[in-house]
Amino acid sequence: MSRLENSTKNFVLTLGNNILSSLLGLVSRTVFIYILGSTYLGLAGLLGNVLGFLTISELGIATAIGFSLYKPLAEKDYKSVSALMSVYRKAYVIIGNIVLISGIILFFSLDFFIAPSQQPKGTTFAYFAFLFNTVLGYFLSYKTTLISSDNQAFRLVPINIVMNVMQTVAQIIVLVLFKNYTLYLSVQIVCSFIIMLLQNRYITRKYKEVDFYSKEELKPEQKSSLKRNIGGLIIAKIGDYLVNSTDNLIITKLVTLAATGIYSNYLLIRNMVNGYISTLFASVTAGIGNVVAVESDERKEEVFNIMMFCAYFIYCFEAVCFLCLFNPFIGDIWLGENFTFNTFTVFIIVINNYLTGLRMPLITMKGAAGTYMEDAWIPFAFAIINLVASIILVKWMGVAGVFLGTIVGSLLTADWYRPIIIYHKVFHTSVMKYYKRYIAYIVLGLLNMCIAYVGCELVKIKFVFVGFIVKIIISALVPLIINTALFYRTKEFNALKEMGNRILTKIKSKLSLN
């Protein structure tokens, strides 16, 4: 099966899994909120971020191992694959124990993150449930890196779908019958354990040539590459945590735990949609790694430009829909106005997400090319600026200040420096072409958002659902019409259209088989 076929299959099947998971997640979240309230939502988000600090000890080993597996898998060098996976397994056993011990110690600092007066019933059990789930992943999930690097992750989708359905149904039943957060988390732990066991069993059977307990030594060049990449990823992991996991901490500490719960609803929808988009980029990462290894610099840059346009087209569409539909959906359709932020805060959240989306091609190319050391300082500097700016701005602007701080951090670090590394180290050409495209995409994105938002604000229909449908139509048509009119003659647009046609063909073939 070709790289393209594998990438398409990865995308289609994983997309289907994500859509089903999203629908189940919305139903589960709705039941959760109406039975347990937003405080428990805030607790879940906060604990995830607090314990996320412990995953720094992973030090980017999964990413480095995944990159190192591309070549031996392509060459069917199973001795090298076995050696790499054995090192990976041993490292994760050590890390799992470190995380467990560190988590127990960190528990005694929980009152710093959540004042005792704000801690709902079951907080202690919830903390250790989250900790156990985190540790479980280190002991049981390492093999999934192998199947992902082999561009075969789609084969795990049936397992994921069945277990996601079972977990969601079981959790809803527990909430309705017992109204108990402890039992809700217990179901999650049991299902996580089962899904990891099933995935492990499948991967072990599929890769019979791989000895996960191999005593084979790594080749000198493999050791050197791993050390170099892990060295660059250590700072990146710390920085990424501080950038991505401190928002809830700051909101809880300087605003309220309830505000964290409200934000978690926006985050749920954002993560659902971003999950679909990330599936597209993740499904082609292994293929991009192959392109970087064998194609010319011109071809690499051409592929990157296509990825960048795809990111703009998709994330611009997403940003317009988020800006116009977030509050109408959450406030009017789903939960009520008490669970929404003001328009300015939503706008800042959307802009932050849009800029993150535009960086996705850089992250994908960086992972495929293995350029980890060259910009290792970026996440750390990004994190410091983000933290300082967010703490200052949150006192002045409230929740919006947290996300504005993230935007400031990204513009002053990753957004201007990371492209230099990719263009100089991978494409061996000037980075100015990238900056021109990037600025143009930001301006066009803002233009799309403003036009669509003004159009939606003009909609004054008495019936809420009818008005919401009209806003959906406006939000969808504005970016589609503007961007199609501007780019329909470009090769990047044609490449996106061909990709869409291939995906639709694959979906139709799957439906016809069923």
What are these regions (language model features)?
Residues 17-25, 29, 47-55, 59-66, ...:
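Short runs within selected transmembrane alpha-helices of multi-pass transporters and secretion channels
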Residues 427-430, 453-514:
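Membrane-proximal transmembrane or re-entrant/amphipathic helices at the cytosolic face
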